[in-house]
Structure formats: structure tokens, C-alpha cells
């Protein structure tokens, strides 16, 4: 496909984006808004953002959800801006500095919350800054300005949603159904690989792919939940399927690890059974029926615990899968599965990374303020706004540098494109609203196609072009003002990019160590006799941390294996029949405190000291288990855990 070619699958969204822009433009001028540009800009960003992220037309519900987040972020930002102005109206410089800190604070929060919700906080940060900067000439008009901006933004969001509904958005339900079938086959094939106990790298690749696919399925569940309330039952089932899929991965990998020391546990009966190849979900269904008969014949005691648990989880997966596909009423058996253990929320491991993002945003905004005050440039305020926008939105993404480059390319492309519209097209459409709508629809259509291709600079060009062309009421054509706005955007993006380069993010290794120590803490916390604690479902949180580790350190197999081993240890100890007595319970609390100290230690020396203390406590704990005559189901996992911690002591403590 050529660089300027148009694929059929890109046309519908391009028309949708053009329609959203035209609707916002028409409504803005029809209701005599002072700056319809904000409504048009909002409609374009809300519609195009999910398409750029997805690399194609977004699924149903994505645009609505983004619009909802934008409304929340705008209102939070407006309220914060009003509070800052009311409190500091007599100290303008202090007021702007506080706004810079507010933008950094919102970026810090957006780095810690779920990626889906971080957009609202990023928006809240720079909305307050926009209000404070814009009202500098007339601060008494602040409430009116805030209300007008909110109204224009809400109109833009409504127009984007109307365009989305008008062009029948894609439903993700069929993709979910196909993935459920395919994922079950992949789970069975992973178990086959683990029982064969073949090449470790092949097994690592297989379970790594399954972790990514299970995480992707969880993302599909979020999309399905946003799409319509009629999928509420399917959403409940998919939430339980996520845990079951992670359980299947854990049991398969534990089957592989067990054979490193005790290969005789997997009998020839099961080896021969899992030799039969499977290609479809129907093949897996037949094999599971046969496998349940084999287990009933051999007995639970003669069946390895990992295989028994795997078959139980796969059977539940199958049952819920059928319910998701048919979306029928939840029956009593399904309800029993769905009323499972409460999920534990994951503890953020990127606090240092979030603090780096805080300083990047705050310093870049302060640098923009100094540049504005030092030069006295009329578009210094525009540069400041672009600095806040770039840093607030870039920091929450995995590669902020590339986001800043995208904005630079976009603002550079917007200069000639905006010039064409400002000097030629818009002046010649002054007598016709229809011609004005058509001209902007053409802009939205072609940039909508480029956005779906994820062309570098396309998203920035769309927003920057709309921002600098004259879409005010009434329209005024001052070339110096246009040039100032265009150059202000470019300078702001370059300054933001400079700060991102200068304030280096060296938090990757620290985040990796925190994640690994959180796995250790989870394994240690599984050693408990507290019934409520044992019923907590840590698996989704642990695999979410593993997925983050895989993204932070792609290809680092030793780290992945260590993390997976800790997850397996956690699951095994959680189900182990630990003797119930006060002596062991008190020691469990002591070990949990020590594990927490390892995570929170700020220096390598303290971390090594607490880790050494944890190893000593594990030795004492093993002795206590022998005194209290704990069964092998308890002593063996604890011994394996202690051995792993001894082996990887330096990786878990050294910076």
C-alpha cells in the first residue's frame, strides 16, 4: 500500500471524523458561541484520539468513554482554575506558578491511576493552566470564560458521540467470542508443552504470549462494558474468565517446574493423553470430557494436583465461555463460580516514575512561564499551553519522547496547512456556511485516514491546524496573530521536548526491583492461617504486575521466570494446609512486616539487611513447620521459596 493510498477499512472512520467536525462547527455558529473553535477542536480530538491509539476505527463505546473522561477532566480543571484565581488574583506570578505545580500534580496522579482513566487527570492539569493564562488581561471575566469553555467542550463531545452513533460503530463482541475460543486452544497447547517438558525457551514464549493475550482480553472486556449495558452479564463472566485463564497458565507452568525435580509425578497415562493434538475449541471440549473420565477412574489422589486444578479451571472456563457467547441469563452453577474470591487491587510500582513525570511537567511549565515573561512575546501564552498539553498527555504513555516528536511534526505540518486555510480557503467561504463546512470536512476526512495509519505527526497536525485557523465569532483575519499562534505552538512543543530530554527517567531498574519484591511479598503473605486473607484473589494483580515487568524489560527471561515462580509459590502456599496455631500465626505477621520493609527500604544497605532478615525468618519458619508436623504440601513449597530467594538474593536487593 502506497504512502498516500486510502484503504476501504479507513473510509468509514474518516467520514465519521469529518461529520463530527462539521456538526460541531455548525452548532457552534448556530448558537452564536464566541469561539466555536473549541467545540470543533474537542470533537476532533475526542473522535480521533481512540482511532490513533487503536490504529484503525475504534470499537463501539471508546469515543463515548473518552468524551466522558474529557468532560470530567474539564470540570475538574475549571474548578481548580477558579479556586487558584480567587485565592491568588492579587499575585499573578504566584498564580501561574501554582498552576504549573497543579499541572505537575495531575500528571503525577495520571501516572499512578489506570491508563484508561489517566486522560481525565492529564486534561484537568492543563485546563486550569489554559484558564489562568487566558484571563490574564481581564481576570474579572473568569467565571464567564470557564462556563463558555465548558459549554463549547460539551458541545464538541456530544457532536463526536452523535457522529459515532450515526455511522454504526463496530461491536467488539464477535472479536471477544473468537478470542475466547482461540485462547482455550492455546491454553491446552501450553499444557501439552509443559507435560512434554521440552525446550524451556519455547515454553517461555508460549506462556508469555498467553499472558499478553489474557491481558488483551481484559481490555476487550472494558470495551464491551463501555459499548452497552446489555453486555452486563457477559462482562461478569469475562471478569471471572480472566482469573481462570491466569489460573490455567499458573498450573501449566507449575507442571513444567515440578518435572525439573520430580518428573515421576506426571505418569505415563497423562503423558500419552496430552500427546493428542488439538486444533479447535471443539477438540479441547472432547479432550476435557475424556480427561475428566480418566481422573474419575484414576482417582484424585493419583492425579497430580496441578493437572487436577487445571482441568477444574478449564471446565469452568468452558462453562462461562458458552454463557458469554450466548449472553443468556446466569444460571445457578455459573453464579457459584462468579461469587468467587474478592480481587485484591494492585499496588502501584511506578511511584518514582510518577515523580519524574511530575517534575518534567512542572519544570517545563515554569520554563515556559520564564520564556513568556522574559521575551514578552504575545504568543508566549500559546507556547505555555502547548507545553502543558504535550507534557500532560505524553507523560502517561510508555514513550513520552516519541509523543513530543509527534507533536513537533504535527505543529510543523500545521503551519503550511493552516496557512492555506487562513489565506485562501476560509476567506473565500465567508458568504457560505456550506462551503466552510465542506472545506473543514475535507481536512477531517484526509487527516482521519492518516490518524488511523498512526502516521507520525497526524494527530498533532489535526489538533494544531484547527487551533490556529480562524474559527471565532465573528471571524477576524490578522496575519500577525495567525503567525504568532502557529510559531507559539512550535516553540511550546520544542521546549517540552527539551525538558523531556534533559530530565531523564532512570526509574526503570527501580520499578523492576520493586515489582520483583512485590512478588516476594505476595508469596510470603500467602503463608497465613487467616481464612479471610486466604480467600483473597491476588492472581489478576500479580499478573498485571508481571505484564508491566514484561513491558519494562522486553526479552529479560530470567526476570520473567523469577516473577512467575513467585506467582506459582503464592498460589501453592495459598492452598497449602498450614497448621492453625498462635505460634505460626504470630510468625506469619512478622514475616509479612519484614517483606514490607524490603519493599519500602530506600537504600541498598537497608534492603539487604531486611532481605537477610527475611531469609533467616524463613529458615526458622521451616523449623517451626517441622516441629508442628506440617505435611509435605506445606514444607515443600516453603523450601522451594526459600531456595529461590537465596538464589536470586542479589537481583532482588541491588540497584
Curated annotation (Swiss-Prot):
Major localization class: membrane
One Gene Ontology molecular-function label: transmembrane transporter activity
Pfam families: FUSC
Membrane topology: Multi-pass membrane protein
Superkingdom classification of source: Bacteria
Compartment annotation: Cell inner membrane
UniProt cross-references to InterPro entries, sorted A to Z: PHBA_efflux_AaeB/fusaric-R, PHBA_efflux_pump_AaeB
GO CC term (a single one): plasma membrane
Regions that span the bilayer: 13-33, 38-58, 67-89, 93-112, 121-141, 152-172, 370-390, 407-427, 431-451, 459-479, 482-502
Induction summary: Positively coregulated with aaeA and aaeX by AaeR.
GO biological process: carboxylic acid transport
Alphabetized UniProt keyword annotations: Cell inner membrane, Cell membrane, Membrane, Transmembrane, Transmembrane helix, Transport
HAMAP family attached to this UniProt entry: AaeB
Stated role: Forms an efflux pump with AaeA. Could function as a metabolic relief valve, allowing to eliminate certain compounds when they accumulate to high levels in the cell.
Entry's family note: Belongs to the aromatic acid exporter ArAE (TC 2.A.85) family.
PANTHER family: MULTIDRUG RESISTANCE PROTEIN MDTO (PTHR30509:SF9), P-HYDROXYBENZOIC ACID EFFLUX PUMP SUBUNIT-RELATED (PTHR30509)
Name of the protein in question: p-hydroxybenzoic acid efflux pump subunit AaeB
Organism: Escherichia coli O9:H4 (strain HS)
Amino acid at each position: 500500500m502506497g504512502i498516500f493510498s486510502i484503504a476501504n477499512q479507513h473510509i468509514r472512520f474518516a467520514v465519521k471524523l469529518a461529520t463530527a467536525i462539521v456538526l460541531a462547527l455548525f452548532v457552534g455558529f448556530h448558537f452564536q458561541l464566541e469561539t466555536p473553535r473549541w467545540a470543533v477542536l474537542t470533537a476532533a480530538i475526542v473522535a480521533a484520539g481512540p482511532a490513533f491509539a487503536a490504529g484503525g476505527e475504534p470499537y463501539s463505546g471508546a469515543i463515548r468513554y473518552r468524551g466522558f473522561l474529557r468532560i470530567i477532566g474539564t470540570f475538574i480543571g475549571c474548578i481548580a482554575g477558579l479556586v487558584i484565581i480567587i485565592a491568588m488574583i492579587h499575585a499573578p506570578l504566584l498564580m501561574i506558578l501554582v498552576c504549573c505545580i497543579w499541572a505537575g500534580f495531575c500528571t503525577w496522579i495520571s501516572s499512578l491511576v489506570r491508563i484508561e482513566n489517566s486522560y481525565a487527570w492529564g486534561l484537568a492539569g492543563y485546563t486550569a493552566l489554559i484558564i489562568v493564562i487566558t484571563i490574564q488581561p481581564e481576570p474579572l471575566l473568569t467565571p464567564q470564560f470557564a462556563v463558555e469553555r465548558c459549554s463549547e467542550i460539551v458541545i464538541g463531545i456530544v457532536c463526536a458521540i452523535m457522529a459515532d452513533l450515526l455511522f454504526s460503530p463496530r461491536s467488539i463482541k464477535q472479536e471477544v467470542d473468537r478470542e475466547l475460543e482461540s485462547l482455550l486452544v492455546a491454553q491446552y497447547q501450553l499444557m501439552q508443552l509443559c507435560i512434554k517438558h521440552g525446550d524451556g525457551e519455547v515454553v517461555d514464549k508460549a506462556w508469555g504470549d498467553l499472558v499478553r493475550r489474557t491481558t488483551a482480553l481484559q481490555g476487550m472486556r472494558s470495551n464491551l462494558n463501555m459499548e452497552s449495558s446489555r453486555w452486563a452479564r457477559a462482562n461478569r463472566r469475562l471478569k471471572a474468565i480472566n482469573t481462570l485463564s491466569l489460573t490455567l497458565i499458573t498450573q501449566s507452568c507449575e507442571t513444567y517446574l515440578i518435572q525439573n525435580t520430580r518428573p515421576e509425578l506426571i505418569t505415563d497415562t497423562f503423558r500419552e493423553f496430552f500427546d493428542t493434538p488439538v486444533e479447535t475449541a471443539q477438540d479441547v471440549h472432547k479432550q476435557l470430557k475424556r480427561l475428566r473420565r480418566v481422573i474419575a477412574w484414576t482417582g484424585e489422589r493419583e492425579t497430580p494436583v496441578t493437572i487436577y486444578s487445571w482441568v477444574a479451571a478449564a471446565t469452568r472456563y468452558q462453562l462461562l465461555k458458552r454463557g458469554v457467547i450466548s449472553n443468556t441469563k446466569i444460571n445457578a452453577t455459573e453464579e457459584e463460580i462468579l461469587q468467587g474470591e474478592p480481587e485484591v487491587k494492585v499496588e502501584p510500582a511506578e511511584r518514582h516514575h510518577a515523580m519524574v513525570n511530575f517534575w518534567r511537567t512542572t519544570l517545563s511549565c515554569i520554563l515556559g512561564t520564564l520564556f513568556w515573561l522574559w521575551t514578552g512575546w504575545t504568543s508566549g501564552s500559546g507556547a505555555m499551553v502547548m507545553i502543558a498539553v504535550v507534557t500532560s498527555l505524553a507523560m502517561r504513555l510508555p514513550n513520552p519522547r516519541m509523543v513530543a516528536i509527534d507533536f513537533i511534526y504535527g505543529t510543523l505540518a500545521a503551519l503550511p496547512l493552516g496557512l492555506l486555510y487562513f489565506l485562501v480557503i476560509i476567506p473565500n467561504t465567508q458568504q457560505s456556511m456550506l462551503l466552510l463546512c465542506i472545506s473543514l470536512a475535507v481536512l477531517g476526512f484526509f487527516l482521519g485516514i492518516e490518524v488511523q495509519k498512526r502516521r507520525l505527526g497526524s494527530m498533532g497536525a489535526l489538533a494544531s491546524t484547527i487551533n490556529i485557523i480562524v474559527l471565532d465569532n465573528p471571524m477576524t483575519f490578522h496575519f500577525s496573530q495567525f503567525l504568532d499562534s502557529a510559531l507559539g505552538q512550535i516553540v511550546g512543543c520544542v521546549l517540552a521536548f527539551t525538558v523531556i530530554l534533559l530530565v531523564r527517567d532512570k526509574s526503570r531498574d527501580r520499578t523492576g526491583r520493586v515489582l520483583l519484591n512485590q512478588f516476594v511479598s505476595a508469596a510470603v503473605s500467602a503463608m497465613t492461617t487467616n481464612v479471610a486473607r486466604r480467600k483473597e484473589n491476588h492472581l489478576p494483580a500479580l499478573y498485571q504486575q508481571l505484564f508491566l515487568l514484561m513491558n519494562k524489560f522486553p526479552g529479560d527471561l530470567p526476570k520473567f521466570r523469577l516473577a512467575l515462580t513467585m506467582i506459582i509459590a503464592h498460589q501453592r502456599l495459598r492452598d497449602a494446609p498450614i497448621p492453625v496455631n498462635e505460634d505460626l500465626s504470630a510468625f506469619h505477621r512478622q514475616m509479612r512486616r519484614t517483606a514490607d520493609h524490603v519493599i519500602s527500604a530506600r537504600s541498598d544497605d537497608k534492603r539487604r539487611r531486611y532481605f537477610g532478615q527475611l531469609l533467616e525468618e524463613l529458615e526458622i519458619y521451616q523449623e517451626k513447620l517441622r516441629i508442628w508436623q506440617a505435611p509435605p504440601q506445606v514444607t515443600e513449597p516453603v523450601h522451594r521459596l526459600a531456595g529461590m530467594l537465596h538464589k536470586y538474593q542479589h537481583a532482588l536487593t541491588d540497584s
